[in-house]
Amino acid sequence: MAAAPRAGRRRGQPLLALLLLLLAPLPPGAPPGADAYFPEERWSPESPLQAPRVLIALLARNAAHALPTTLGALERLRHPRERTALWVATDHNMDNTSTVLREWLVAVKSLYHSVEWRPAEEPRSYPDEEGPKHWSDSRYEHVMKLRQAALKSARDMWADYILFVDADNLILNPDTLSLLIAENKTVVAPMLDSRAAYSNFWCGMTSQGYYKRTPAYIPIRKRDRRGCFAVPMVHSTFLIDLRKAASRNLAFYPPHPDYTWSFDDIIVFAFSCKQAEVQMYVCNKEEYGFLPVPLRAHSTLQDEAESFMHVQLEVMVKHPPAEPSRFISAPTKTPDKMGFDEVFMINLRRRQDRRERMLRALQAQEIECRLVEAVDGKAMNTSQVEALGIQMLPGYRDPYHGRPLTKGELGCFLSHYNIWKEVVDRGLQKSLVFEDDLRFEIFFKRRLMNLMRDVEREGLDWDLIYVGRKRMQVEHPEKAVPRVRNLVEADYSYWTLAYVISLQGARKLLAAEPLSKMLPVDEFLPVMFDKHPVSEYKAHFSLRNLHAFSVEPLLIYPTHYTGDDGYVSDTETSVVWNNEHVKTDWDRAKSQKMREQQALSREAKNSDVLQSPLDSAARDEL
């Protein structure tokens, strides 16, 4: 009889375990309804909302040069393509814009929700325009009508948003669309960068609707202030939230009945926003992309293509290159040497990133170069230095830190020295030398070729022409060269970023036997054209007759200056030339040599130099 209670307890244990299991809390992440005992009580969770419907509107005219890269950037936007519609219009083309767009649309049509294609092959120009870059009234009106048609299409298809993108605007941040949507603004633009102060927004507007300079602009443009800012104007690339009730009152055409300002598409739309009480915003929280500085009305299609190519070069200075669309055939490039006998590009083997960027930059400009492996001074030991017969110039000290020559500076000198030897050995009449840490100015190739033609036409006796440098004599202007545009007689200068050297000039530099009395190469050159301020250095070189000139304005600048993110020096952050134990890394943060060119007084500016038409091809920065 005593065993019966124990058997009952054993029978009750499974029931107790089942009850505890039913009452136990659900594990983290279990779906709602999973705790239901009966099947009919179980239910599935609600699915997330679908991505918003977006229409991307692209208007293109004479944009064949830009479209492969612009469209490649649009392809990489992180937004579901099945929730994205394309609205594309092109007309009045003098190039093959229609062909490029058609090739792309045929390839991507099945990837997107829908495609609306509005091509017009004729006419090729407007009757009242002076050239392809001139904005006449009829062109403004036509563009306004096209934007209005795109807006109507977006409304008709019940799109949540419409994103307007100019054909030469590069949206490189793939999250741009989602970031703008998250701002929850009726009209919002991503701030696009350019080579100058220009961007796709205004901070001020006059009572007549024109641009007004304000103190607020530059801090936003430079991202000293970050955020989303209320502004009177955004243009080129911007997003409209069509879910907002006020968006129904926005229009590009016809202009508002009360509109009396200039007949300009961006001003007309800004006025429409103002009348609808819709505030425009520009966001600079992230880096979103780039756009070119507008060209003047007299500019050509070649100017425009080279201007956009320069945007791509600027992208590569601090970002990965902007890759073109894989759906568009790449045009064939035919690099040349720009009329030089040789184009040298110096690069340290361990600086692969610089090499790749420079080779891509030169290829983009169709410049053929010979890659020269730089002498790595840091890898040289004292025995190797002595075997070359190298001795430092007696008494030399760095002008900023009082240190002797570094191994990095030694390697830099030998790299240039070896090129001078090759110039002489091969009998090269004129050569162009690049270092690998430089950025190109707009129209670089054409401007330098024009300069060299002027030099040859005038029969100028020259040995070396700086293409990029840091001007050290800033007290008075340099002497302009008569009848040669963009050229001055060089005074004391730093840097050997890029220069042109003649056979005669290379012979003069080698004849000075500089290895036996070495100093940094950018100190040696001013000694040789007798402009160095330290007479003790010059005394060691009896023949100082190098004929040196400089391009003005410069066509080459450094990619980075002291203090910039990414600044690296292979010459100043090194060790002393004859002692591996004496380091000079203190210069990394304090280097004065690689600081940006100091501002010149009005009296010291080279204002007498003859200017080229290409110097003023771009409009005012703002």
Curated annotation (Swiss-Prot):
Impact reported for D463A: Loss of galactosyltransferase activity
Function statement: Beta-galactosyltransferase that transfers beta-galactose to hydroxylysine residues of type I collagen. By acting on collagen glycosylation, facilitates the formation of collagen triple helix. Also involved in the biosynthesis of collagen type IV.
EC assignment: 2.4.1.50
Effect of D461A: Loss of galactosyltransferase activity
Catalyzed chemical reaction(s): (5R)-5-hydroxy-L-lysyl-[collagen] + UDP-alpha-D-galactose = (5R)-5-O-(beta-D-galactosyl)-5-hydroxy-L-lysyl-[collagen] + UDP + H(+)
Effect noted on mutating D587A: No effect on galactosyltransferase activity
Keyword rRNA-binding: no
Keywords linked to the UniProt accession: Disease variant, Endoplasmic reticulum, Glycoprotein, Glycosyltransferase, Signal, Transferase
The organism of origin for this protein: Homo sapiens (Human)
Tissue and organ distribution: Ubiquitous with higher levels in placenta, heart, lung and spleen.
Record PTM text: N-glycosylated.
Residue positions with a glycan: N96, N184, N381
Protein name, as recorded: Procollagen galactosyltransferase 1
Biased composition (Basic and acidic residues): 588-606
Lineage: Eukaryota, Metazoa, Chordata, Craniata, Vertebrata
Cystine pairs: none
Annotated signal peptide: 1-29
Coiled-coil annotated residue ranges, if any: none
Listed GO CC annotations: endoplasmic reticulum lumen; membrane
Motif (Endoplasmic reticulum retention motif): 619-622
Main location: endoplasmic reticulum
Broadest EC class assigned to this enzyme: transferase
Disease: Brain small vessel disease 3: An autosomal recessive form of brain small vessel disease, a cerebrovascular disorder with variable manifestations reflecting the location and severity of the vascular defect. BSVD3 patients may have disease onset in utero or early infancy with subsequent global developmental delay, spasticity, and porencephaly on brain imaging. Other patients may have normal or mildly delayed development with sudden onset of intracranial hemorrhage causing acute neurologic deterioration.
PANTHER family xref list: PROCOLLAGEN GALACTOSYLTRANSFERASE 1 (PTHR10730:SF28), PROCOLLAGEN-LYSINE,2-OXOGLUTARATE 5-DIOXYGENASE/GLYCOSYLTRANSFERASE 25 FAMILY MEMBER (PTHR10730)
GO biological process: collagen fibril organization; positive regulation of collagen fibril organization; protein O-linked glycosylation
Gene3D superfamilies: Spore Coat Polysaccharide Biosynthesis Protein SpsA, Chain A
Name of the gene this protein is made from: COLGALT1
